[in-house]
Swiss-Prot record:
Its main location: mitochondrion. Pfam families: ATP-synt_A (PF00119). It is found in: Mitochondrion inner membrane. This is ATP synthase subunit a. GO terms for molecular function: proton-transporting ATP synthase activity, rotational mechanism. It comes from Vanderwaltozyma polyspora (strain ATCC 22028 / DSM 70294 / BCRC 21397 / CBS 2163 / NBRC 10782 / NRRL Y-8283 / UCD 57-17) (Kluyveromyces polysporus).
Length: 254
């Protein structure tokens, strides 16, 4: 049985259920905290969409409003970023990415839960796949002309080699910066909450006076928690927007 002994355990991946046989190595089928929370996030996303669209009514209930607002926001963002006739082709991808990261971020704010988006290997792998997919899309559409993306219009000929190097490094950095930005923000926020929460707990346990005075730092922690909710939503939107921007660059070379 797996027990959580510290808030920092939300960053650790532990095995919850092992599959052991005397004949085959089934360790790849073990259920870990990572796999469990992936399933939870996907179930929440599917449940939300089923519950809000299952009534088949023209005028939705007030419970439909938040999801419809999210849908319209991502729709307009994708249309504004990618534009043209191809934006609708990539909208399901952008919307799914946004919802997945948003739900994962919000679930990670629950005390003692597992922080999916604080797993740097997972998030950077996801951003690398997005970068690689957009690069392949650009090559498939433009062929060798895709490399013109690394030469800004109007660049003086003597500066072309230098700018090609700079633009190439900048483009390659996208594969990691997209995920690193998300992971660092989530990880920093969670660590701050853990540190402040531990200090507050030690402070209020000193005596009765500190127990009363602890209301002030407790209110500050609640304010930081509200800020973490905002960061969770903002980082989800930033990830989705940058993904759409990378796809646009591959499609239109600008």
């Amino acid at each position: 049985m797996y027990y959580i002994n510290s808030p920092l355990d939300q960053f650790e991946m532990n095995t919850l259920l092992k599959f052991v046989t005397p004949f085959f190595d089934m360790s790849n089928l073990n259920i870990t905290t990572f796999g469990l929370y992936i399933i939870i996030v996907l179930m929440v996303i599917v449940s939300l969409n089923i519950l809000t669209t299952n009534n088949n009514t023209i005028i939705g209930s007030r419970w439909n409003l938040p999801l419809e607002m999210i849908y319209d926001t991502i729709l307009n963002t994708t249309k504004g970023q990618i534009g043209g006739k191809l934006w609708g082709l990539y909208f399901p991808l952008i919307y799914t990415l946004f919802m997945f990261i948003l739900i994962a971020n919000l679930i990670s704010l629950i005390p003692y839960s597992f922080a999916l988006t604080a797993q740097i290997v997972f998030v950077i792998s996801l951003s690398f796949i997005i970068w690689l997919g957009s690069t392949i899309t650009g090559f498939n559409k433009h062929g060798w002309l895709f490399f013109s993306l690394f030469v800004p219009n109007g660049t003086p000929t003597p500066l072309v080699p230098l700018l090609v190097i700079i633009e190439s490094l900048s483009y390659i950095a996208r594969a990691f910066s997209l995920g690193l930005r998300l992971t660092c923000n989530i990880l920093a926020g969670h660590l701050l909450m853990v540190i402040l929460g531990g200090l507050l707990l030690n402070f209020i346990n000193i005596n009765k006076l500190t127990l009363i005075l602890g209301i002030i730092p407790f209110a500050m922690i609640l304010a930081i928690l509200c800020l973490e909710f905002a960061i969770a939503m903002i980082q989800s939107y930033v990830f989705a927007t940058l993904t759409a921007s990378y796809i646009k660059d591959s499609l239109y070379l600008h």
